[in-house]
């Protein structure tokens, strides 16, 4: 069922979170520049429905909502809903005739992966996290190629470590990053995701107040939706509003990374890979409710390299963060060393590696 036209085609399944969608977009853009026709498979309610068309790619939707749940009726209905979504995915494959199907996570990957296998189309999986999700664990048994971002992600099957595809602008930023702390003030970027991280919003105003008594420190704090007024008021109450920029969202992360000397953040897979690529030291506070605690495993990639500090959320307080940031403010050379160690573990050609696997499978026919 391989497409006989000269133009190669790929159907990409990635959705739900930016950690799935953005790496997939990097691969999609690369293959598109190589003359490939790219189409997406996702769900209408998740972020891929908005993001993918914004980047110029067509998307088809399958209906798999309601599969998860604890109610008896949902459990009884689940097999039928999964079967229906597989049939919907097969219809897309029959119409589009891809040479390769690639799954990078999200609800559509499961049905789409099964449909690819039933249709005789090569299936490539890419796992972004250091611990594989349930869908990729199951699909890995039927995939043509299994790829992962971090060494040791899959322990019972053959998998190739290729890194996480990230935007080429961030790789270029890391290439240009020649020094850190080029002035006296320690510049701290605090990123809590689109909803913010309550722990950061609660403690960072006091951290800035405490560190500023002995060191010069400025903060760029992304607080998330609906948190701007309260967090800004707390910085102001503590007399720190002149040393902080508070924003609900940071649209230009390239500019934020360029500005920062150190980052305080969660440890999602894409974040960890971006920190490595741009060569930034970090204080990582894994999201404690992540499935299988995969963010802690992600963080250890940088921590074990000496590029980051791991701070489990239950022990995070003003004192802990003050101690770490004061230490870095006092030792600029170590700050630079940590940034270099982060860069040393980066896999900078991840996009090309993933794309080349797809190209190789398509050429095999």
From Swiss-Prot:
It comes from the Bacteria. Keywords: Cell cycle, Cell division, Cell inner membrane, Cell membrane, Cell shape, Cell wall biogenesis/degradation, Glycosyltransferase, Membrane, Peptidoglycan synthesis, Transferase. UDP-N-acetyl-alpha-D-glucosamine binds at residues 17-19, 129, 167, 194, 250, 269-274, 295. Cell wall formation. Catalyzes the transfer of a GlcNAc subunit on undecaprenyl-pyrophosphoryl-MurNAc-pentapeptide (lipid intermediate I) to form undecaprenyl-pyrophosphoryl-MurNAc-(pentapeptide)GlcNAc (lipid intermediate II). It is an enzyme of class 2 (transferase). Belongs to the glycosyltransferase 28 family. MurG subfamily. It is found in: Cell inner membrane. It catalyses: di-trans,octa-cis-undecaprenyl diphospho-N-acetyl-alpha-D-muramoyl-L-alanyl-D-glutamyl-meso-2,6-diaminopimeloyl-D-alanyl-D-alanine + UDP-N-acetyl-alpha-D-glucosamine = di-trans,octa-cis-undecaprenyl diphospho-[N-acetyl-alpha-D-glucosaminyl-(1->4)]-N-acetyl-alpha-D-muramoyl-L-alanyl-D-glutamyl-meso-2,6-diaminopimeloyl-D-alanyl-D-alanine + UDP + H(+). Its main location: membrane. GO terms for cellular component: plasma membrane. InterPro entries: GlcNAc_MurG, Glyco_trans_28_C, GlycoTrans_28_N. Transmembrane segments: none annotated. This is UDP-N-acetylglucosamine--N-acetylmuramyl-(pentapeptide) pyrophosphoryl-undecaprenol N-acetylglucosamine transferase. Coiled coil: none annotated. GO terms for biological process: carbohydrate metabolic process; cell division; cell wall organization; lipid glycosylation; peptidoglycan biosynthetic process; regulation of cell shape. GO terms for molecular function: UDP-N-acetyl-D-glucosamine:N-acetylmuramoyl-L-alanyl-D-glutamyl-meso-2,6-diaminopimelyl-D-alanyl-D-alanine-diphosphoundecaprenol 4-beta-N-acetylglucosaminlytransferase activity; undecaprenyldiphospho-muramoylpentapeptide beta-N-acetylglucosaminyltransferase activity. Its EC number is 2.4.1.227. It is a peripheral membrane protein. SUPFAM superfamilies: UDP-Glycosyltransferase/glycogen phosphorylase. It comes from Shewanella pealeana (strain ATCC 700345 / ANG-SQ1). The keyword Transit peptide does not apply. Pathway: Cell wall biogenesis; peptidoglycan biosynthesis.
């Amino acid at each position: 069922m391989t497409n006989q036209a000269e133009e190669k085609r790929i159907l990409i399944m990635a959705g739900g979170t930016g950690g799935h969608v953005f790496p997939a977009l990097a691969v999609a853009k690369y293959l598109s520049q190589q003359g490939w026709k790219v189409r997406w498979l996702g769900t209408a309610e998740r972020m891929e429905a908005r993001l993918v068309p914004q980047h110029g790619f067509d998307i088809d939707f399958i209906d798999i909502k309601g599969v998860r749940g604890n109610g008896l009726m949902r459990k009884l209905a689940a097999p039928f809903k999964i079967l229906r979504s597989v049939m919907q995915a097969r219809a897309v494959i029959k119409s589009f005739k891809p040479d390769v199907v690639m799954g990078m996570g999200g609800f559509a990957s499961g049905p789409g992966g099964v449909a690819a296998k039933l249709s005789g189309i090569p299936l490539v999986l890419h796992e972004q996290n250091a611990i594989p999700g349930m869908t990729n664990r199951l699909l890995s048994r039927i995939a043509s190629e299994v790829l992962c971002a971090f060494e040791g992600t899959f322990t019972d099957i053959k998998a190739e470590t290729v890194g996480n595809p990230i935007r080429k602008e961030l790789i270029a930023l890391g290439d240009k990053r020649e020094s850190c702390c080029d002035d006296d003030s320690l510049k701290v970027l605090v990123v809590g995701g689109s909803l913010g991280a309550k722990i950061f919003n609660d403690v960072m105003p006091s951290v800035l107040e405490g560190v500023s008594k002995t060191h010069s420190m400025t903060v760029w704090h992304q607080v998330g939706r609906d948190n701007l007024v309260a967090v800004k008021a707390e910085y102001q109450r503590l007399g720190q509003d002149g040393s902080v920029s508070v924003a609900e969202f940071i649209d230009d992360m390239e500019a934020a990374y360029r500005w920062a000397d150190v980052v305080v953040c969660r440890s999602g897979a894409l974040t960890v890979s971006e920190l490595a690529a741009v060569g930034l030291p970090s204080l990582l506070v894994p999201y404690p409710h992540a499935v299988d605690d995969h963010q802690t495993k992600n963080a250890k990639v940088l921590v074990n390299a000496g590029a980051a500090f791991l701070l489990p959320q239950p022990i995070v307080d003003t004192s802990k963060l003050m101690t770490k940031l004061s230490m870095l403010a006092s030792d600029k050379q170590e700050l630079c060393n940590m940034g270099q160690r982060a860069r040393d573990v980066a896999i900078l050609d991840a996009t090309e590696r993933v794309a080349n696997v797809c190209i190789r499978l398509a050429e095999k026919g």
